[in-house]
């Protein structure tokens, strides 16, 4: 796609002219280079069904805590500890509940004064400030310029790297459009804490195309990760699209991709497909599914992503420019009816393997690398929230490989939506229902 046509699209975003019929008409043409495979059956996201009970993991030092058979009966990892890494307990911790009065919280950001900026996902979507004592503000004003409350869903929120100077916050949201369509957007605004409002709210990016879904909040992606230069990385979910849209493998749409844009919403200058005909210039990588975590490792600078698999095959991926992460051609999971997806293969030349995968699934949501000093035992750790797993999973990394695993917070039996490491070195966790938790050393 030429840069001019991208700017035309951006101009439409900036004007907030969200025209559902136009978006719905933007069905992508098939990519002739994309391998063909049978599309998975559309079904609820793993973890959405609370009727199943996730068994308590066994905690035996040096042995995997997962003992159930994999969903894909003949599945075998392609290298040691690609799945079911040995259990290792690293540190004792204390859990403090800051508040249990939130409504479907989705993301945490840390304000310089020690307060928390938290998104509540939907019904209606809201942005709130939570004080250290647990008091919760009224919804931040200014979001009604984006969409009506019953059509708006908030996802991630992140402070501009220069927030101390410009008070700007970036956030992602989705909007319910007509006829069952929805879409994912990136916006920013200037936060006035005293007034409890966002000003100068501007949409900078709209994923294309809008997509029909049974549940308008399904597989939106939406996490934000800032690069050192201030540009934004953002996953866009595949939106559960089946035949004939093998969208994650097609390069004329944003679905099933990691995108990389400037703070103005333009394609970043170092993107791998910037001048390639037929490829959206914002694309950084392709072939991902329903990504609910994206973060940079502060030690290596490497970008990591987590995504939901189907039945089995949740993934932790090391994201590199121009790479294809394989969905739905390869997967360590199976389709929801219990049959193979496509050819039922887990590897293919030219397609990236996950660094780690979970089978059965944990339904991962939220990704954070430990970078504090409160828990020296957690150095080299990355945390992954588990919705269906009802735990906070700690993975220990060495040379970009998982060498140990430790499920935390299993005693709470809570679906974990987000995890962040605070400026104080404590680990902060959102449960899907209503709680903000703080983990400190015991």
Where are these predicted regions, by residue range?
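Acidic, Gly/Ser/Thr-rich repeat motifs that build Ca2+-stabilized beta-propeller blades
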Residues: 30-36, 40-243, 293, 302-309, ...
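Conserved blade-ending motifs and adjacent loop-strand segments that build the rim/top face
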Residues: 288, 401-423
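Bacterial N-terminal signal peptides
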Residues: 11-21
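Bacterial N-terminal signal peptides that target proteins for export
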Residues: 2-13
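Beta-propeller blade signature
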Residues: 184-194, 248-264, 319-320
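Surface-exposed loop and turn segments in beta-propeller and other repeat-based domains
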Residues: 137-152, 201-220, 263-284, 328-359, ...
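Repeat-solenoid scaffold signature
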Residues: 279-320
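Boundary at the C-terminal end of the N-terminal hydrophobic targeting segment
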Residues: 23-25
């Amino acid at each position: 796609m030429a840069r001019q046509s991208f700017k035309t699209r951006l101009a439409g975003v900036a004007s907030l002219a969200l025209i559902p019929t136009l978006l719905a008409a933007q069905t992508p043409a098939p990519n002739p280079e994309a391998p063909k495979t049978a599309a998975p059956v559309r079904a609820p996201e793993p973890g959405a069904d609370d009727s199943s009970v996730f068994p308590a993991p066994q905690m035996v030092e040096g042995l995997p805590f997962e003992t159930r058979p994999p969903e894909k009966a003949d599945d075998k990892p392609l290298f040691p500890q690609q799945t079911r890494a040995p259990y290792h307990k690293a540190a004792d911790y204390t859990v403090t509940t800051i508040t249990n009065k939130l409504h479907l919280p989705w993301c945490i950001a840390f304000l310089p004064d020690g307060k928390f900026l938290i998104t509540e996902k939907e019904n209606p979507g809201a942005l709130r400030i939570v004080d250290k004592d647990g008091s919760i503000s009224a919804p931040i004003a200014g979001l009604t310029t984006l969409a009506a409350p019953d059509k708006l869903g908030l996802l991630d929120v992140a402070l501009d790297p220069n927030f101390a100077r410009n008070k700007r916050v970036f956030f992602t949201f989705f909007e319910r459009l007509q006829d069952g369509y929805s879409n994912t957007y990136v916006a920013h605004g200037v936060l006035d804490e005293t007034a409890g409002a966002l000003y100068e709210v501007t949409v900078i990016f709209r994923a294309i195309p809008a997509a029909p879904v049974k549940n308008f909040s399904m597989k939106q992606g939406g996490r934000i990760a800032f690069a050192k230069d201030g540009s934004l990385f953002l996953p866009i979910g595949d939106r559960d699209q089946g035949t004939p849209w093998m969208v994650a493998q097609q390069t004329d749409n944003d679905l099933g991709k990691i995108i990389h844009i400037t703070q103005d919403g333009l394609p970043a200058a170092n993107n791998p497909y910037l001048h390639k005909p037929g490829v959206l210039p914002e694309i950084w990588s392709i072939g991902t599914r329903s990504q609910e975590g994206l973060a940079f490792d502060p030690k290596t600078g490497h970008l990591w992503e987590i995504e939901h698999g189907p039945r089995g095959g949740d993934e932790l991926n090391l994201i590199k420019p121009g790479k294809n992460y394989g969905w739905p051609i390869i997967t360590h999971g199976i389709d929801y009816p219990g049959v193979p997806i496509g050819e039922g293969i887990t590897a293919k030349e030219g397609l990236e393997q996950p660094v780690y995968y979970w089978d059965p699934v944990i339904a991962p949501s939220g990704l954070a690398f430990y970078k504090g000093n409160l828990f020296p035992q957690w150095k080299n750790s990355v945390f992954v929230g588990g919705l269906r797993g009802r735990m906070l999973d700690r993975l220990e990394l060495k040379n970009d490989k998982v060498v140990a695993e430790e499920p935390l917070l299993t005693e709470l039996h809570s679906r974990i939506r987000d995890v962040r490491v605070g400026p104080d070195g404590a680990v902060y966790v959102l449960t899907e229902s209503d709680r903000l938790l703080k983990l400190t050393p015991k």
